[in-house]
């Protein structure tokens, strides 16, 4: 497990970004999932102020799924700091293409690894901005308030049928073909079409971002994920999600990577005390009484000077 945090300024608040990753073999003898939550770049604490979150799930039932997922994640982590520019989506696309080529070549060079592949879902956190890249059926979710939204779209035959209206989302959860993938990293020399899918988000105070493998979301419903993600500490949230998947009897590896945008209030003009209260000024009621007394005194003086009877 890894856990890091940093602080970024927003106009009226400070966001403390905290991240954590947990993975477990869970329902299988070996763990073909890999995960990371780490600072990248050359800044303080070993990072440039940016976070990289990664989940990769090696293809089950195929050779060397664990090798494919590890190569893909390592290539992604190596490639991103070397990619210049402010276009994080482009940087992720280039890194994904490099990861795909590296996994494919490794499969060609080692006969026992031929045909290996992996999912790859990642997020670059740059200040309050999150850029997500995705290939396969691992997922990214955003929890905002009480609303949990699936950000990514599964690259599976069943997901395509749901999108085309042929079956319902509920039926898809029970469909025996739900794990048949249409796109993965490493099985072809080049990624198809416009892959990876890119999604851009602006994180708000209180948001939670979750990356997870299918061994987790297959057995947990939205309400269970919402409850776990409500934990203030992302490490506790990630552990709770993985343990819940194991308790639900997942037959696959279970992985959760959580990022929390924790609000830390700073003073604003609306919350600062008034100048009078900051400097110990005289209350308005006292001033009014003093003015009234002065008026009475002036009136008495006028009467005495003019010689008028009281």
Segments from the language model and where they lie:
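PP2C/PPM-type serine/threonine phosphatase catalytic domain
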Residues: 1-310
């Amino acid at each position: 497990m890894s856990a890091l945090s940093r602080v970024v300024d927003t106009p009226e608040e400070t966001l403390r970004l905290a991240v954590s990753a947990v993975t477990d073999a869970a329902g299988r003898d070996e763990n073909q999932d890999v995960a990371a939550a780490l600072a990248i770049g050359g800044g303080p604490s070993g990072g440039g102020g940016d976070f990289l979150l990664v989940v990769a799930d090696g293809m089950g039932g195929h050779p060397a799924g664990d090798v494919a997922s590890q190569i893909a994640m390592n290539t992604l982590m190596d490639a991103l700091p070397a990619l210049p520019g402010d276009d994080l989506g482009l940087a992720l696309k280039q890194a994904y293409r490099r990861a795909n080529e590296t996994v494919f070549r490794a499969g060609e060079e080692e006969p026992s690894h031929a045909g290996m592949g992996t999912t790859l879902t990642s997020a670059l956190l740059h200040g309050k901005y999150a850029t997500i890249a995705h290939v396969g059926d691992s997922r990214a979710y955003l929890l905002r308030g009480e609303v949990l939204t699936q950000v990514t779209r599964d690259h599976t035959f069943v997901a395509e049928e749901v999108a085309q209206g042929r079956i319902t989302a509920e039926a898809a959860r029970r469909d025996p073909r739900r794990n048949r993938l249409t796109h993965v990293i490493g099985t072809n020399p080049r990624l198809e079409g416009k892959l990876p899918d890119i999604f851009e988000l602006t994180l708000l105070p209180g948001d939670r971002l979750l990356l997870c493998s299918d061994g987790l979301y297959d057995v947990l419903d939205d309400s269970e994920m919402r409850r776990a993600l409500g934990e203030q500490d992302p490490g506790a949230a990630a552990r709770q999600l993985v343990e819940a998947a194991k308790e639900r009897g997942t037959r696959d590896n279970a992985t959760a990577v959580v990022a929390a945008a924790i609000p830390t209030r700073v003073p604003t003009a609306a919350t600062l005390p008034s100048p009078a209260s900051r400097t110990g000024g005289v209350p308005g009621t006292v001033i009014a009484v003093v003015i009234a007394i002065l008026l009475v005194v002036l009136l008495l003086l006028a009467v005495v000077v003019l010689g008028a009877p009281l």
